[in-house]
Structure formats: structure tokens, C-alpha cells
């Protein structure tokens, strides 16, 4: 690059002018022309990074004359700022940088659970990746004592790393590259816009595609992508994805497309105003939102599902003031563009009933039993069979059941969900609890004997409840007789 170095004042003036131009709407969108700084960047990078240059060239940023320097510019004193060919820049473009033009989106994102994704230290998931699966074998300047490669290449790539800037200005290789949704950036901001808006094309069509979300929302513990593709929504998307106008600037369900929803449709995208009818009041239009929790009415992440305003309060988010009923109405305003009101209302009855079943039959008694078993167990996490059984029961199988019901995935609700929960509750957890009771009673330790008696009493109480008494062969005789009659009829129809 041969362009002379701009001084700090010029850099600050450019940043201010860019933000002011956008805020004041001096023109429809973008800048009047490419800045001389970005032109200088492009002289080299169109040769050195052809793919980056071509992606940007096909993007709306290119059409808006927003280029390298407008995004990568940095101020003196920023932790990751460095001089490059006379320009002060930063490698990482953080949400704070994107907010120069996209302030509304950045604020909504900052108020979402997505931006807090890296706050996983201390979780059982993190213990698994760092200790049980991992070791301290990956040593870097930022982690001289070592860090787990399983955490670096696994958890952190979705949840986000805490990016460390080294003494020489470079970024620690354990923490970068990283586009995790909750990445903690050197400028103090949380999140990564490029988790969804992949650089350097920043395609709305790609961000709206279900596979974009599926990078993280998949697998045994949160298989939203697999559930979506099993559902009628996913089937419709595969059939009609070329007819959904997914590259449209304005993308309003019921106006710009109607043949299928994507994840973005339900959780983020705009909805039109709808007049009142006999089943509901008038619905105002909803704008696009980057707070993906504003339309969900259950947080299904923990052992026992909680209402989203409760988890928002724990994170100190403004959503603590938005109750689940309001959020559900926001989601229903999406649904009614393709479904009539009774269909929508009845779906939520089904969904809530599955949550209640999971809670009442397995999660609530299971959690209480697990806590009572703790004094009889090795205190080291995941050093006991029961640790693994209980963890997978709620973290994998229990989530699959709940997520399956939330997105109309029957196989994930039943066979991958409640079936697995029940199988492991009765065939693993109950026998493991009984074994702990037996060992505790025989230990000779008064504290363990007392703990064993308390656990035995609770287990007996749980198994004698109506939800579980079939296990003790105590099912109501009339119901038992009726089920035997149905089984006989089934055998007559299908037995050879």
C-alpha cells in the first residue's frame, strides 16, 4: 500500500462521519463513495485474498461503499489495535464495531442469550470438555499452563472464546480464530455478528437458512436442526426453498413468502399487521429482532424448564421485564400467518402438556433423588455412574423430548426423547439409587446410613406415585385389564 498514514484525528473523524452519515440518513443507505483508506486496502487484498475480495464484491456492503477500513478501523488504545501499512486497524470486527451502522441490531443482540454464550465456565458441559475429556496439553502464550483442545475446538467454537491479545499484538491461537456467538472480544463487547452473518458476503439469504443455525443447534443435546428437518416446516422448506425469496431485502412472512418458515421466520423475522377476527384481537406488525428469546415461552436448557424471564433476570438482561405470555403472543403472531387460531392455541396445549409430563414424572423427582444420593457418592463430578445417567437423562434425552415438542418433531419427542428418558430412569437410575441405598446401609457410617434411609424413603414414595406404580405392578386393575384387552386385539390383527 502506498497511501500515506492517516493520523488518529483523521481516523476518529472518519469513524464519526460514517456513523453520522448512516444515522442522519444523508442518503438511502451507505456512503457516497469508497474511502481512500479502503481503496488502499483493496490494492493488496484483491491480490492476496482473492476469495475475500470476491465475496465482498458480491455483498451489499460493496454496493453501499462500505469496505475494509470502515469495519476494521480502530482507535489508539484499543487492546487489539495495531498499525498495518500505516493504518490503525483491528483483526476482529466486534458487535461494537458493527453498531456504528447497525445500532438497533447490536443493542438487541447484546440483550439476548446469544451474546452471553461464552459464560459457560463452571457448567457441567465445561467440566466435561476441560477435565473429563480434555487435559492441559494445548500450551500457548496465553495459556502457558495449558488448556483443553477439546474446549478450544469444541465448546468455544459455538459458545465463543475470550479472545486474548498477546504482548506482540497478535491473538492467542487458543482463542482465535473463533466466531462463537458469545465470544468475549478485546474491546469488552460480547458476541460475534459473523456467527450468523458470515464474512465477507454478509448474505441475508445465508443468515435466514436453517443450516446457518444448525452449526450450533444440532447434536444429541440440542438437535433443533434435526427436529426442524423432521417437522412439516422442514419438509416444506426443502420442497420450496427456491420459492421463498430468501435474498429479499424485505422478508415478511405472508407478504414476501408463504410456503415454509425457517428458524429466522419464527424467532427473528418481521410479521405483518393482521386485523381482528372472532378468535383474536388485531395484531400489530412486528419488526425484525436480534433478541432471539423474545418469542420463546420456555427455556428448555436446564434440568427443569423455566420461563424465559427468569433466566433473563439471572443474566441481568432487560428481558426480565417481558413475561412468557407476552413472548408467546409474539410467536403466535408469526404462526397465524399460516395457521388458524385454534390450530395455534391447541399446539401450545400439546407443547405445555409435554413439558408438564417431563417435569412431573421424571425431572422433578429425578433431581430430588439425585440430590439425596449425593452424600452416598464420590464427590468428584462424573466419577459415579449416577452422574452420567442423570446428566444424559436431562441434558440429552430430556432436552430432545422438550425441543421435539416445541418444534413438532414427533420422533425426537418420543423415541429420541421420552422413550430414552423413561428407559434410563427405570433401567439405570432406579437400580443405581437402590445400589447406593444398599451400600450406605451397610457402610457402618451413621451419616451414610441416615442418608441411605432418606434416599430409600423418597425412592419408595416416588415409585408408589400414580406416575410410576406400574413399575411395582400396582397399576389400577381396571386400567391393567383394559390394556391387556387391547394388546390381545392387537396380536389378533398382526400376529402370524
Predicted segments, located by residue:
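Bacterial N-terminal signal peptides that target proteins for export
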Residues: 1-11
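Short sequence/structural segments immediately N-terminal
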Residues: 25-496
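Bacterial N-terminal signal peptides
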Residues: 10-19
Amino acid at each position: 500500500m502506498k497511501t500515506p498514514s492517516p493520523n488518529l484525528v483523521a481516523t476518529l473523524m472518519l469513524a464519526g462521519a460514517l456513523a453520522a452519515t448512516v444515522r442522519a440518513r444523508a442518503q438511502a443507505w451507505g456512503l457516497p463513495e469508497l474511502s481512500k483508506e479502503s481503496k488502499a486496502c483493496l490494492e493488496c487484498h484483491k491480490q492476496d485474498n482473492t476469495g475475500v475480495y470476491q465475496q465482498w464484491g458480491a455483498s451489499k456492503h460493496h454496493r453501499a461503499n462500505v469496505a475494509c477500513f470502515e469495519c476494521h478501523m480502530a482507535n489508539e488504545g484499543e487492546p487489539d489495535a495495531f498499525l498495518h501499512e500505516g493504518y490503525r486497524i483491528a483483526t476482529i470486527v466486534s458487535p461494537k464495531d458493527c453498531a456504528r451502522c447497525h445500532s438497533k441490531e447490536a443493542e438487541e443482540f447484546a440483550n439476548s442469550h446469544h451474546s452471553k454464550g461464552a459464560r459457560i465456565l463452571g457448567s457441567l458441559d465445561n467440566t466435561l470438555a476441560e477435565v473429563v475429556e480434555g487435559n492441559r496439553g494445548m500450551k500457548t502464550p496465553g495459556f502457558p499452563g495449558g488448556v483443553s483442545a477439546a474446549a478450544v475446538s469444541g465448546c468455544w467454537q459455538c459458545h465463543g472464546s475470550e479472545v486474548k491479545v498477546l504482548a506482540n499484538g497478535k491473538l492467542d491461537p487458543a482463542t482465535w480464530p473463533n466466531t462463537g456467538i458469545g465470544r468475549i472480544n478485546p474491546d469488552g463487547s460480547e458476541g460475534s455478528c459473523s456467527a450468523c452473518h458470515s464474512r465477507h458476503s454478509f448474505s441475508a439469504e445465508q443468515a435466514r437458512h436453517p443450516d446457518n443455525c444448525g452449526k450450533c443447534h444440532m447434536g444429541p443435546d440440542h438437535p433443533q436442526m434435526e427436529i426442524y428437518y423432521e417437522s412439516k416446516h422442514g419438509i416444506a422448506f426443502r420442497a420450496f426453498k427456491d420459492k421463498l425469496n430468501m435474498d429479499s431485502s424485505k422478508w415478511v412472512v405472508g407478504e414476501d413468502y408463504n410456503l415454509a418458515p425457517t428458524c429466522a421466520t419464527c424467532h427473528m423475522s418481521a410479521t405483518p399487521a393482521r386485523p381482528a377476527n372472532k378468535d383474536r384481537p388485531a395484531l400489530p406488525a412486528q419488526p425484525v429482532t436480534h433478541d432471539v428469546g423474545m418469542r420463546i415461552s420456555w427455556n428448555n436448557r436446564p434440568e427443569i424448564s423455566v420461563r424465559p424471564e427468569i433466566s433473563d433476570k439471572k443474566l441481568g438482561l432487560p428481558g426480565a421485564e417481558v413475561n412468557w405470555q407476552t413472548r408467546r403472543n409474539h410467536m403466535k403472531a408469526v404462526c397465524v400467518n399460516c395457521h388458524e387460531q385454534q390450530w395455534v392455541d391447541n399446539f401450545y396445549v400439546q407443547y405445555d402438556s409435554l413439558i408438564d409430563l417431563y417435569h412431573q414424572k421424571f425431572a422433578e423427582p429425578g433431581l430430588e433423588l439425585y440430590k439425596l444420593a449425593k452424600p452416598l457418592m464420590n464427590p468428584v463430578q462424573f466419577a459415579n455412574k449416577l452422574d452420567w445417567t442423570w446428566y444424559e437423562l436431562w441434558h440429552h434425552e430430556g432436552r430432545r423430548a422438550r425441543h421435539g415438542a416445541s418444534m413438532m418433531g414427533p420422533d425426537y419427542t418420543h423415541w429420541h426423547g421420552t422413550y430414552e428418558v423413561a428407559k434410563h430412569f427405570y433401567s439405570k437410575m432406579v437400580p443405581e439409587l437402590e445400589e447406593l441405598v444398599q451400600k450406605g446401609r451397610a457402610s457402618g457410617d451413621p451419616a451414610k446410613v441416615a442418608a441411605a434411609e432418606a434416599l430409600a424413603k423418597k425412592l419408595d414414595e416416588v415409585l408408589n406415585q400414580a406416575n410410576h406404580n406400574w413399575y411395582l405392578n400396582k397399576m389400577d386393575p381396571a386400567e391393567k385389564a383394559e390394556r391387556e384387552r387391547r394388546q390381545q386385539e392387537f396380536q389378533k390383527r398382526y400376529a402370524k
